[in-house]
Design a protein with these regions (language model features):
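Metallo-beta-lactamase
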Residues: 75-121, 126-127, 135-136, 167
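Active-site metal-binding motif and surrounding structural segment of the metallo-beta-lactamase
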Residues: 15-19, 27-70
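Active-site environment of divalent metal-dependent phosphoester hydrolases
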Residues: 28, 52-58, 76-79, 126-129, ...
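Divalent metal-coordination and catalytic microenvironments
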Residues: 12, 22, 36, 51, ...
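Cap/insert and terminal regions of metallo-dependent hydrolase folds
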Residues: 23, 27, 149-174
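Stable alpha-helical elements in mature extracytoplasmic
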Residues: 28, 32, 59, 75-78, ...
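Conserved beta-strand hairpin/beta-sheet module of binuclear metal-dependent hydrolase folds
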Residues: 1-35, 130-144
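Active-site neighborhood of phospho(di)ester-bond hydrolases with catalytic His/Asp-centered motifs
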Residues: 21-23, 45-53, 70-74, 121, ...
């Protein structure tokens, strides 16, 4: 996991190359690349977006030139149009920053010797939230559906619902 100015970035690095979960801000793309490059000689092959917020997707236009971007269909829809989050307006991302693979409920990527399962959990933090399960490593990346030490921000303006976020947490504890 890489940590920085935005959300945490999950990394799978190995013989197949590199997969990252979320990519933070475009001005940080070179620093993000410098952090994962020593982990594998292979290329960046996948970027998984856990939701559409700028601190998780705004380096997509940089990394989308070399890797497949994968996200829930609502993430692509929201990144394709002007959006508002906490009073800030964000312009649509250019084509190279949009997810090219989308899903409605779940998608699996078989990469670096394990199944990486991406599951949409509707209406928690936003209406495009996904949780990423690294099945062999027994690791979960929850995007902004989990905040260490405090309750997550629920973006009701963009489809988030407190009760659904609670339901997600409850389902993962089983």
């Amino acid at each position: 996991m890489l940590e920085g100015a935005g959300g945490s970035i999950g990394v799978s690095a190995g013989a197949d190359g590199v997969l990252i979960v979320d990519d933070q801000f475009s001005p940080l793309a070179d620093k993000v690349r410098a952090a994962f490059k020593p982990l594998s000689p292979g290329p960046l092959r996948f970027v998984l977006n856990t939701h559409f917020h700028f601190d998780h997707t705004h380096a997509n236009p940089v990394f989308g030139r070399e890797a497949l971007i994968v996200a829930h269909a609502n993430v692509r829809r929201r990144l394709s149009v002007e959006t508002n989050v906490l009073g800030e307006t964000y312009k649509p991302l250019p084509k190279e920053g949009l997810p090219v693979v989308t899903y409605e409920t779940t998608v699996s990527i078989h990469f670096n010797g394990e199944e990486i399962r991406v599951v949409h959990f509707p209406s928690g933090h936003t209406d495009g939230d996904s949780v990423v399960f690294f099945t062999a490593s027994n690791v979960i990346h929850m995007g902004d559906d989990f905040f260490a030490g405090r309750f997550p921000f629920v973006d009701v303006e963009n489809g988030g619902r407190v009760l659904d976020l609670y339901g997600l947490a409850e389902s993962l504890s089983d």
